Amino acid sequence: MSEKINTKPFILHSDFRPSGDQPQAIEKLAENLTDGLAHQTLLGVTGSGKTFTIANVIAQLNRPAMLLAPNKTLAAQLYAEMKAFFPENAVEYFVSYYDYYQPEAYVPSSDTFIEKDASINDQIEQMRLSATKSFLERRDTIVVASVSAIYGLGDPDSYLQMMLHLQQGAIIDQRQILAKLAELQYTRNDQAFQRGTFRVRGEIIDIFPAESDDRAVRIELFDDEIERLSLFDPLTGSSFGAVPRFTIYPKTHYVTPRERILDAIENIKKELVSRREYFIKEHKLLEEQRISQRTQFDIEMMNELGYCSGIENYSRYLSGRNEGEPPPTLFDYMPPDAILIIDESHVTVPQIGGMYRGDRSRKETLVEYGFRLPSALDNRPLRFEEFERLAPQTIYVSATPGAYELEKSGSEIIDQVVRPTGLLDPLIEIRPVSIQVDDLLSEARQRADKNERVLVTTLTKKMAEDLTDYLDEHGIRVRYLHSDIDTVERVEIIRDLRLGEFDVLVGINLLREGLDIPEVSLVAILDADKEGFLRSERSLIQTIGRAARNLNGKAILYADSITKSMEKAITETNRRREKQTKYNEEHGIVPQALNKKVGELLDIGQGANQKAKANKQRGKMAAEPTALYNAPKNAKEYQQQIKKLEQQMYKFAQDLEFEKAAAIRDQLHQLREQFVFDN
């Protein structure tokens, strides 16, 4: 944890070597990045090992990287995979740290003001702080992030100014250290030593860094000199050895030097005067009173405490930006030569473009009715054109790239169509709509007899429900996956499908990325000739691809005519299948079924209670730590259980029962990891 940049190389751990289309994809991607190409696309089919390809590119070029995923679930999967590939390097996780978030809003029609309400998850906050620290300190850093990365973060210049640099032999007064820690928003707690706190015992100061999970630093002073710096386990007190120097980072990204706060207050006062004059001129006296009262209260809080509720709304002044300038984000912490990888780019890119507009609409109402100053509009996510300017060299990764990625990449579309397993894209059949229900019933029975699974996608909720009832009445074990089901329950349903609890899964939009089930040998697309979002070329290719992990994969499209989208999807699937077949023949490869155990593919996002249930269904009961048998169902229950275990752990530590405390710490690690993936 030196102040100098750590230049350790990436070391990739894997039992496999690149095969299929992976070697040429790795070579081409790396070559383009070395040549300075700004945009390229990895067009990788389902099951072709796109993440492994990207990991090889990062290791080969030895450059820091950010992986953007469209949601927390996929971000967690990528994080777990990258951690497995690079156990010796810094693989970090950066997603929204809110368990619950209700932004402030005003509804003019009913004159209703909704206060901001939020619950911050300490574990995710620690991981976010660790991510920015790794970017600032280490070259061997991979940060897996959600679209949260384009939202405003503390100004990196202020953040770096506030750091406390400690060095053995340095002359520094104990009071200076304590005052600096208070500036960094650390709190003194001599009883409960927790993340973001420090304690003092004579001339020894112990600090538990905000970004650390299991290491604290001890400062041993001799008069006004730092005699020794060492790292230790904050729970057991066991030492990890001395270090020559250590840097303490602020407890939050939003920490601001006192001088900057005082400057900001003066600018806020000037804007308040201007806004009051505007409201009086427009005869909006209620709004004038409202903005005066709220802003003056915030100013007083900032003056006395250094922060206020909703301080992010004054971020323009706190970061010293001009009106309309982009807010500082995670991109400002990235090294200039970092690589950006946008996973499932056909979903992620449109998300990035849509964030700004929704946020702007809500804030304009708050400004218009006197709840916020106009400068609050600059507390926002990046606009798409700002994101484009800030983004470093970019690789778009998708099985179905969007028009934007294809246009940006030009001719640099790298195909990764051949799978290492030799599996082919599914065969496609077109059958008439008039027989779709009865034909599907017959196909489902055939697949169930072979212990294979079926995915069925319909156009409407009612049709999905009716079809589920019909199949159920005719003896088919069937479940219906709908939009009200949360992520954890969704993973449990998929797990039950894989385990053979039922044979057919019906849904409206089953193309969601990550729904890869090797046991599925048939995908049935009802009313495939109805043009629209759910039957577009991209949606059809994604849905057909759900059967691509099975040796007997087939897709049946029920249609009375062939639409342009169907034609393009069929042509593309056949192109891939021909290329895969030719490669297999040339290299003597026999397609192999994907025989991964259920646990291997679905450990992420699954609670321990589901694990126990699955083991029981297989006639076994695994011994899990006691605390995890009744796994929490939601974020609130997780927090309660974590706090309860922490209290027990600290109690054992105070009573010097370190073995018991360490056992509970292991349970906490498991529970926190499970929480990250479940949420």
From Swiss-Prot:
Binding locations of ATP: G44, V45, T46, G47, S48, G49, K50, T51
GO BP term, pick one: SOS response
GO molecular function annotation: ATP binding; ATP hydrolysis activity; DNA binding; excinuclease ABC activity
Keywords: ATP-binding, Cytoplasm, DNA damage, DNA excision, DNA repair, Excision nuclease, Nucleotide-binding, SOS response
Classification via Pfam families: Helicase_C, ResIII, UVR, UvrB, UvrB_inter
SMART domains from the UniProt entry: DEXDc, HELICc
Superkingdom of source: Bacteria
Keyword Cytoplasm: yes
Motif interval(s): Beta-hairpin: 97-120
Domain Helicase C-terminal: 436-589
Localisation per UniProt entry: Cytoplasm
Cited InterPro entries: Helicase/UvrB_N, Helicase_ATP-bd, Helicase_C-like, P-loop_NTPase, UVR_dom, UVR_dom_sf, UvrB, UvrB_inter
Domain spans labelled Helicase ATP-binding: 31-414
Entry-linked Gene3D superfamilies: P-loop containing nucleotide triphosphate hydrolases, UVR domain
GO cellular component entries: cytoplasm; excinuclease repair complex
Keyword hit for DNA damage: yes
Domain UVR: residue ranges: 639-674
PANTHER family assigned to the protein according to its UniProt record, in alphabetical order: UVRABC SYSTEM PROTEIN B (PTHR24029:SF0)
NCBIfam families xref list: PRK05298.1, uvrb
Subunit structure: Forms a heterotetramer with UvrA during the search for lesions. Interacts with UvrC in an incision complex.
Similarity comment: Belongs to the UvrB family.
Free-text comment on this protein's domains from its UniProt entry: The beta-hairpin motif is involved in DNA binding.
Functional description taken from the UniProt entry: The UvrABC repair system catalyzes the recognition and processing of DNA lesions. A damage recognition complex composed of 2 UvrA and 2 UvrB subunits scans DNA for abnormalities. Upon binding of the UvrA(2)B(2) complex to a putative damaged site, the DNA wraps around one UvrB monomer. DNA wrap is dependent on ATP binding by UvrB and probably causes local melting of the DNA helix, facilitating insertion of UvrB beta-hairpin between the DNA strands. Then UvrB probes one DNA strand for the presence of a lesion.
The protein's name in its UniProt record: UvrABC system protein B
Organism: Haemophilus influenzae (strain ATCC 51907 / DSM 11121 / KW20 / Rd)
Encoding gene, per UniProt annotation: uvrB
